[in-house]
Amino acid sequence: LLNILCGSIPLDGGDVLVNGKSIRKQKDFQRYATIGRVYQNPSLGTCPNLTMLENLSLADNKGKRFGLGFGVNKKRIDAYRAELAALGLGLEDKLDVKMGALSGGQRQAVALLMATMTPLNFLILDEHTAALDPKTAETIMELTGKVVRGKGLTAMMVTHNLRYAVEYGDRLLMLDHGTIVLDRAGKEKEATSTEELLQVFNRYSIL
């Protein structure tokens, strides 16, 4: 589903509408201008040989016409520091550190920030905590909820952690071989428990 949204997999039929407009025929660069994505692998979505400052600057200029006016200046550096400080991980003092030297959790936190620096139609979270240890995964999920709600974003998250789905999701979809087998929102979603989701999951996983 995510790859269809991003254009990596062509549609066999139907259409993809974003804000009521079809994006089926859009080129990849056109789609990504208003789509943010955080990948499962912390090594993706950032440039390991560039500093955090350089990575943030690239993300900040996404979809913009480049020119001398888009270089890093003190005002931008101060803004990046403020954004990083808001994450509460002490990253604001590591702007000159290369991304490859950061831990997986730190990289995912920066990747989340980078993915949401410019205006978005929606944010894709592609199992973005799956490669992290449990404690770090909890931290990244808390940050994700804070960023998504703080910026008023529409986000689509793929996860095998059913508790995360129930705790953070406003609408729950469960797919089995590309077919939606569960779709709950509103009061129905609020009444859904992790245990109930697990029962549905197990029902299809043994087929």
Where are these predicted regions, by residue range?
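Helix-to-loop junction immediately C-terminal to a conserved catalytic motif
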Residues: 6
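Conserved ABC transporter NBD signature motif
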Residues: 11-22, 184
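ABC ATPase NBD coupling module
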Residues: 22-36, 66, 73, 189-197
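Q-loop/switch helix immediately C-terminal to the Walker
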Residues: 50-62
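ABC ATPase C-loop
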Residues: 115-116
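Catalytic Walker B motif of ABC-type/P-loop ATPase nucleotide-binding domains
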Residues: 123-126
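H-loop/switch region of ABC-family ATPase nucleotide-binding domains
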Residues: 159-160
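Conserved beta-strand-loop-alpha-helix hinge in the C-terminal portion
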Residues: 179-203
